[in-house]
């Protein structure tokens, strides 16, 4: 196996996004600011949902899992990128690269499946309100969430192990700010066509299958909302679902854009920009979208800060 012919001392070089020009230095600190907002926002969401018993519902449990995944995702890539930029070092060990690929792919895959579960939750809440507590009881909700983590992690293991079964006999410079398998495949001196097909199949499973569930769920939700007699009920349903659809659109738009193209057609700059969007920008926007458009989250935050009223 090619792995046996490589040592963990054979480091890769992450070329990153930024150089040390004034413009790029400004952009680097902008990314750090976005990271800080994303880190604090998702941490607050997890803590709020854990601490406030009124948020102990399936919808908010799933939202806390999404925030946890986003929190882990940004911590997988940004700290290493920042360390390399500030220290002037570009190296990452093979073990470090394998670990980064595992968490990176696992978390992206897990989010795909979790977003599908969240859409099913909204479907049951709006279309089957009388059966909601039974259909989304804690055991079922926990199992669906666990399967999201397991399926995503399985894909991460496959990609991490398969990617490092190749030999790297030329340049070890990765034209990215993190270890990303399309960038690594370019460096391999093996025929990667079969593995590219495997990647495409994984993308189908991780993206198209969950998207089908989301589209089906929201098609039924829209029909149910149209037939609602109460204007207040329509408004509440629209507000809740539109927040989720905004997140789905941002996340799947970038993911589908990356996956529908063969690896050989990827350009380094294109990969970097799209990756920055769904690994740094989207995790920052998710808690803002849900908190600004959700009175219960806002109330919980005010209560924790001591500004809420106990009778609210």
Swiss-Prot record:
It holds the Pfam family 7tm_4. It comes from Homo sapiens. Glycans are attached at residue 5. It is found in: Cell membrane. Odorant receptor. Belongs to the G-protein coupled receptor 1 family. Keywords: Cell membrane, Disulfide bond, G-protein coupled receptor, Glycoprotein, Membrane, Olfaction, Receptor, Sensory transduction, Transducer, Transmembrane, Transmembrane helix. PROSITE patterns: G_PROTEIN_RECEP_F1_1, G_PROTEIN_RECEP_F1_2. This is Olfactory receptor 2M7. The keyword Transmembrane applies. It is a multi-pass membrane protein. GO terms for cellular component: plasma membrane. Disulfide bonds join 97-189. PANTHER family: OLFACTORY RECEPTOR. Residues 50-57, 121-139, 220-236, 293-311 are cytoplasmic. The gene is OR2M7.
